[in-house]
Amino acid sequence: MAQTLTSIEPLLPVLRQRPFGLLSDIDGTLAPIVPRPEDAAVPEETRALLRGLVEKGVRVALISGRSLEAARSIAGLPDVAYAAGHGLTLWIDGRTEVTPGLEGYAALVRRAERDLEPLVRNIPGVQLENKGPLLAVHYRRTAQPETAREAILADLQRSPVTERFWVQEGRFLIELRPPIGVDKGTAAIALVERLGLKGAVALGDDTTDIDMFSAIARRREHGLAAATIAVVSEEATPALLRAADYSLGDTDGVRWLLGEMLRALG
């Protein structure tokens, strides 16, 4: 179970590793959760701290379920690495790498959107987010979120397209993802290897970040100095806290941690 992080001290052995990297989710970790997903943004103070870490030589990589375009726009940080679409797309040193096997999934997502259009019309607040080969169905703004969730799952079960995807739930969203063995865990390990990291701190707030925490924990058994940190909200699941070494309270806690890291690095 995650211990509440109140000091930078437990992380110092990890921070002393070279190269050292910060692997972080974006929504709910760096950027506050907002009612409309398109309005999300990393606060400028947080961006400034991340830029400061990059200047200190920290290899920052952001791992998100968003599309690459959306992730880069929300973060506003051109000089860091990205793993978008839960790792389906990597962006490192200005080069984009797309996971093989995604052919046809964008068309399937459009079909799923069409199947869900009646639901969007009938339940105010349901919103579809087309991420290319992935589809997110948001229901945070609905009047009765649990009722909306059940209706979305029922519609997805009726849609013949759904069987071509993994269905995964997150914070007031349900997502369709290509079943090709890529997640935030595989993305984290790819980034550790590509960036040559000897030490890493991983941050996340949602169920999809459990894959990242688990992968980092396994890598630690093979010599990576690492710490995993759950960013806690009222929506955090017990499984997230069980998977992490430490916990912080919301995006303000993350901002505090980034400042402490910057000071510790001198």
What residues fall within each predicted segment?
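Glycine-rich phosphate-binding "P-loop"
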Residues: 31-40, 171-179
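Conserved acidic, metal-coordinating active-site core of Asp-based
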Residues: 115, 123, 129-215, 224
